[in-house]
């Protein structure tokens, strides 16, 4: 096998060009077999095999810097830089990351995970290179989906001032996770039909440069003049009108064409955009036919493409989806907004039922929130459904545009808490802190599926900014017998005891059930509280519990700083300083990839870790 010859960075340079096609086939076969066992991002990686091979052919690692936007499509890059044998532990605890990671290899220039930042990072690398007098190449690879994010345009605007080489590759597969939306998608679609442009332009440029004495001046004039040849053949060339050279489009599965164009791009004195057309899921029919299903997949059967582990109970996203549709039938003002993830956030059915009240704004979380503010001011009730780790990209808009105006915007914060295999960039461990600090914001977390439905109905009837956070995975089915109505700022007592009060938040309620059971088995009589409201605190309940308890234990899947436990602790310190508060939370760290239960134990949030900390506390030892 040709693939076996690649053991370290730049081994690809030893492979003859005629072997690149069979090598691409071997890599695809390896990716399909490997991801079918571990799960991972498949469709995007199958789409960039030839693109990555072509880049590695014209670049030298780690001297040259290759920055992947989002980074989930970097599997072939990892293989070509000597990490093939680590794919058995892809996205597992202590194993190979599903994203570029500088600590993993010097060939990974930038830790990635979120969208639309690669051009900014690349531009920083370019200026550092030039200031330090270095000569390496810097390449940012950004998908057409990521170009729906405004940060990419901020960077393109800034890059236009460059006078030195910077290569920006647009990996255009007409998809983000779901199908792309917006003006840039339409614009790139038009460019796909204009393949003759690049060849014609480069030919004209070379011919003009050969004109004695005035050739270079003619080229400069052509670039600056609005009536230049690009305007005749492709009116409104966005990139060139911004001051960036545009090359393409080129077939992203024709390696010789790409190598030729990439080498041409390396010679451009200034920023250059290379437009590459790829097909998500290429080489594996199930992924090609359904790229959204194979964006991020669990282990699957290669023959059928079916995921091996089927859900036995609905997930929280499913519960949210069904409840929102039901509410949408009753309330014609209810609208739903997603940032390029209608399937992941459970809005597909809402979009089908109420297409005029559904908005996919692209990978543009900041815009999504300010857009929701406008909808609210116009008399509608917007629901913004976004993953916790992505919502943090819009903190200023939530604070300034929604909370400051006290607008009725509902935030459905999906994937809150630990999410597992996607690691540091995707763990939703900060939302309670950044949402709770905002004036006028109300924050809730449900204990089970039914409570999520009730909280969503409460949020629709509420008048003000409100966020409901819920975790990834199966919705908790327990505690159905506890059905106290959701009342503003009120927690729920599941069990009344004495001395120890365990106060759990949302996703940690099942763990709190086990903690209380363990304490009872050890002879204690704990009170068990479902917090429900993280903000505002149920201070009346805290005051009541202070009468016959000496230890409060808060349990949350959020960073300790600014979280529920810290707010409880601050209140008790001010009003009941004799009572100790033990906070079980994520301490000051980024949580790596791994199985959620294993990660909880690793960071001190396991059931036994918390129970033991309670029983070891001074308050209990003194009793």
Predicted regions: what is each one?
Residues 260-263, 295-296, 305, 315-330, ...:
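Glycine-/acidic-rich phosphate or pyrophosphate-binding loops and their flanking alpha/beta elements
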Residues 65, 278-391, 397-407, 464, ...:
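Non-catalytic terminal/interface segments that mediate subunit docking, oligomerization
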Residues 299-303, 307-312, 420-422, 442, ...:
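Peripheral docking tails and interdomain loops at the edges
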Residues 218-286, 408-413, 432-481, 607-623:
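Structural signature of the thiamine diphosphate
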Residues 41-162, 316, 333-334, 338-339, ...:
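Cofactor-binding active-site loop characterized by glycine-rich and histidine/acidic residues
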Residues 86-96, 161-175, 196-199, 403-415:
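A glycine-rich helix N-cap at a beta->alpha junction
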Residues 3, 174-320:
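Long, well-ordered, tryptophan-enriched scaffold segments
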Residues 1-80, 244-259, 275-278:
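N-terminal amphipathic, basic-rich helices that act as targeting or association modules
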């Amino acid at each position: 096998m040709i693939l076996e010859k690649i053991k370290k960075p730049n081994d690809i340079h030893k492979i003859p060009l005629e072997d690149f096609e069979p090598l691409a086939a071997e890599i695809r076969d390896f990716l399909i077999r490997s991801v079918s066992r571990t799960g991972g991002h498949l469709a995007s990686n199958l789409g960039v095999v030839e693109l990555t091979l072509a880049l590695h052919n014209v670049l030298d690692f780690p001297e040259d810097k290759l920055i992947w936007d989002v980074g989930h499509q970097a599997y072939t890059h990892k293989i070509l830089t000597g990490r093939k044998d680590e794919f058995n532990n892809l996205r597992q605890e202590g194993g190979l990351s599903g994203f570029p990671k500088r600590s993993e290899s010097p060939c990974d220039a930038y830790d990635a995970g979120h969208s639309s930042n690669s051009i900014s990072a690349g531009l920083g690398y370019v200026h550092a290179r030039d200031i330090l007098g270095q000569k390496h190449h810097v390449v940012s690879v950004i998908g057409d989906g990521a170009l729906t994010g405004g940060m990419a345009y901020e960077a393109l605007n800034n890059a236009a001032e460059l006078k030195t080489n910077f290569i920006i590759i647009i990996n255009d597969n007409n998809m983000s996770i779901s199908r792309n939306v917006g003006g840039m998608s339409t614009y790139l679609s038009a460019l796909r039909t204009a393949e003759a442009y690049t060849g014609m332009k480069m030919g004209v440029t070379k011919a003009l440069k050969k004109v004695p004495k005035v050739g270079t001046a003619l080229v400069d004039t052509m670039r600056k003049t609005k009536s230049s040849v690009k305007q005749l053949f492709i009116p409104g060339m966005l990139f060139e009108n911004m001051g960036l050279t545009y090359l393409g489009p080129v077939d992203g599965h024709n390696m010789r064409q790409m190598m030729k164009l990439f080498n041409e791009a390396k010679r451009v004195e200034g920023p250059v955009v290379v437009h590459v057309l790829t097909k998500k899921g290429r080489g594996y029919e199930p992924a090609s036919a359904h790229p959204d299903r194979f964006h991020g997949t669990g282990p699957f059967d290669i023959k059928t493409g079916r995921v091996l582990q089927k859900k036995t109970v609905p997930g929280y996203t499913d519960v949210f989806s069904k409840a929102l549709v039901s509410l949408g039938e009753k309330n014609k003002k209810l609208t739903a907004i997603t940032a390029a993830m209608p399937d992941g956030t459970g809005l597909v059915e809402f979009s089908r039922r109420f297409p005029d009240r559904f908005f996919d704004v692209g990978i543009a979380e900041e815009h999504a929130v300010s857009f929701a503010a406008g909808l609210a001011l116009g008399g509608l009730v917007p629901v913004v459904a976004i993953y916790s780790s992505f919502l943090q990209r819009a903190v200023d808009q939530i604070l300034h545009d929604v909370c400051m105006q006290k607008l009725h915007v509902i935030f459905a914060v999906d994937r809150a808490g630990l999410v597992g295999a996607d690691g540091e960039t995707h763990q939703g461990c900060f939302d309670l802190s950044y949402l709770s600090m905002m004036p006028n914001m109300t924050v809730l977390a449900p204990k089970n599926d039914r409570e999520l439905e009730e909280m969503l109905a409460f949020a629709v009837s509420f008048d003000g900014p409100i966020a409901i956070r819920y975790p990834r995975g199966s919705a908790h089915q327990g505690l159905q017998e506890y059905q106290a109505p959701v009342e503003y700022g009120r927690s729920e007592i599941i069990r009344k005891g004495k001395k120890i009060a365990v106060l759990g938040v949302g996703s940690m309620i099942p763990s709190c059930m086990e903690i209380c059971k363990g304490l009872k088995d050890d002879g204690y009589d704990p009170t068990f509280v479902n917090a429900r409201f993280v903000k505002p605190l149920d201070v009346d309940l805290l005051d009541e519990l202070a009468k016959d308890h000496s230890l409060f234990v808060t349990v949350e899947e959020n960073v300790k700083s600014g979280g529920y436990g810290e707010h409880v602790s601050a209140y008790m310190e001010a009003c009941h300083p004799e009572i100790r508060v033990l906070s079980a939370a994520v301490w000051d760290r980024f949580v790596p990839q791994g199985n959620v239960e294993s990660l909880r134990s690793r960071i001190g949030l396991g059931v036994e870790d918390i129970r033991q900390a309670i029983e070891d506390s001074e308050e209990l030892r003194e009793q």
